[in-house]
UniProtKB/Swiss-Prot annotation:
UniProt keyword tRNA processing present: yes
Residue segments, region Required for binding to WDR6: 221-240
Native source species: Homo sapiens
Top-level taxon of origin: Eukaryota
Disease: Intellectual developmental disorder, X-linked 9: A disorder characterized by significantly below average general intellectual functioning associated with impairments in adaptive behavior and manifested during the developmental period. Intellectual deficiency is the only primary symptom of non-syndromic X-linked forms, while syndromic forms present with associated physical, neurological and/or psychiatric manifestations.
Matches recorded under HAMAP family: RNA_methyltr_E, RNA_methyltr_E_TRM7
Annotated gene: FTSJ1
GO biological process: cytoplasmic translation; neurogenesis; tRNA methylation; tRNA modification; tRNA nucleoside ribose methylation; wobble position ribose methylation
Protein name: tRNA (cytidine(32)/guanosine(34)-2'-O)-methyltransferase
Subunit structure: Interacts with WDR6; the interaction is direct, and required for 2'-O-methylation of position 34 in substrate tRNAs.
Pfam families: FtsJ
Enzymatic reactions: cytidine(32)/guanosine(34) in tRNA + 2 S-adenosyl-L-methionine = 2'-O-methylcytidine(32)/2'-O-methylguanosine(34) in tRNA + 2 S-adenosyl-L-homocysteine + 2 H(+)
Length: 329
């Protein structure tokens, strides 16, 4: 697979490199802002789960470029420096992280909190949706510590069967909750974004990061709040048909554009968690072991079977399925 193949398959990936963005997700925030004017009047913004930093880039240009704007980026992983962005390598479920954010804002709360984080997907949709919901609630919890009344919160969601419960939890804290799908987000993906405006916590609510909103046993106060348990919110598409289709392949020479020239990524990730696996695959040393005892027991397996010695099947890297991880050389 050549270097240009992904440029053909993913036009937003290609445009991100050509425009100096660290990732294609920058277009998602730009399209959300075009629809909802997220940056209007914003001088202090927080980017949670910020690495590799494309949303922080957008915030820096839209807010920090005004001279009086301040942007704080938070992530567990290291991130290459960005001009006009204060970086915190920390855990969003820790109170110390919230205090450090406020400290950088000189005691003032933030106008906008965004979160484009997502867990490593497993392919089990129920598990992925649950993990994403818990990550969003953790982001919401830290937002309640740093967001000013009337502020805005934008976070990635997976539109599963239980997303209506998530909407009801968000509406407890915000006067307006919408589900938005940017044009640069693939139609084949269940990804969308919760756009929550008008932060207005319940009377008497005291944020507490010792209870990270991850389960009813952790935070009984949050789960005892009154209100509907499931609601339906408006669904908004960001961008019209004149925008590029994120699910379509495009020729290298785009209509009305200059002659194609390959552009390397703007900023490769720093010490990504998959780095070791990529190194092993390049050397042909990546293997996947499948043992009978690791497989789920089917109904047929419950009947008596002749005893046989356990076997270990090894699939070398060239034999891996198409949906396994692929790393460019």
């Amino acid at each position: 697979m050549g270097r240009t193949s992904k440029d053909k398959r993913d036009v937003y990936y290609r445009l991100a490199k050509e425009n100096g963005w660290r990732a294609r997700s920058a277009f998602k925030l730009l399209q959300l802002d075009k629809e909802f004017q997220l940056f209007q009047g914003v001088t202090r913004a927080v980017d949670l789960c910020a690495a590799p930093g494309s949303w922080s880039q957008v915030l820096s240009q839209k807010i920090g470029g005004q001279g009086s704007g301040h942007v704080v980026a938070v992530d567990l992983q290291a991130m290459a420096p960005l001009p006009g962005v204060v970086q915190i390598q920390g855990d969003i479920t820790q109170l110390s992280t919230a205090k450090e954010i406020i400290q950088h804002f000189k005691g003032c709360p933030a106008d906008l909190v965004v979160c484009d984080g997502a867990p490593d997907v497993t392919g089990l949709h129920d598990v992925d949706e649950y993990m994403q919901a818990q990550l969003l609630l953790a982001a919401l919890n830290i937002a309640t510590h740093v967001l000013k009344p009337g502020g805005c919160f934008v976070a990635k969601i997976f539109r599963g069967r239980d997303v209506t419960l998530l909407y009801s939890q968000l509406q407890v804290f915000f006067s307006s909750v919408l589900c938005a799908k940017p044009r640069s987000s693939r139609n084949s993906s269940i990804e969308a974004f919760a756009v929550c405006q008008g932060y207005d916590p319940p009377e008497g609510f005291i944020p507490d990061l010792s209870k990270p909103l991850l389960d009813h046993s952790y935070d009984p106060d949050f789960n005892q709040l009154d209100g509907p348990t499931r609601i339906i919110v408006p669904f908004v598409t960001c961008g019209d048909l004149s925008s590029y289709d994120s699910d379509r392949s495009y020729p290298l020479d785009l209509e009305g554009g200059s002659e194609y020239k390959y552009t390397p990524p703007t900023q490769p990730p720093i010490s990504p968690p998959y780095q070791e696996a990529c190194t092993l695959k390049r050397k042909g040393q990546l293997a996947k072991e499948i043992r009978p005892q690791d497989c789920p027991i089917s109904r047929v397996d419950t009947f008596p079977q002749p005893l046989a010695a356990p076997q270990c099947h090894t699939l070398l890297a060239p034999e891996m399925e198409d949906n396994e991880m692929s790393c460019s050389p």
